[in-house]
Amino acid sequence: MPAGFTKSLAARLNEISNLDVKEAEDGDCLKKGTVYIAQGGKQCEVIEDAQGNLILSENDKPARGGLKPCADIFFESLVSCSVEHIVCGVLTGMGSDGCKGIRALKKSKDIPVVAQNEDTCVVYGMPRAVVQAGIVNEVVPLEDVADTMIKHIGV
């Protein structure tokens, strides 16, 4: 997603969601019930501090596969975190970004993965990649993604 787009996307999603939605900022401490949208033009990683808090790092690391933010980098950063309760969601998007990172995460933790179904995707690239990789637990229409993830999260 390009720089500048993610702030307005987060604001719009915040208006229509029951959860708090915000554009991620470097140093944000993750809070239950808040959805963070990675900044366009930045890489987003989760770092665990000495007290076990999960902190977002919005940084200028290089693009991977031309992507910045890159979902694979984000998901891979969760592998080393002590948190076990993670739910991954994969929505419409081009390519296979996220597939490698989720595969690595699933190897280290027992996590559910929810993918948007083909019928409700504008572009069925990213969801298709995780479905074909066999790492998805549930495939649901867009309108059911949030409730399905909340069911797994327990919010």
Locations of the language-model features?
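Conserved acid/base catalytic micro-environments in cytosolic active-site loops
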Residues: 1-155
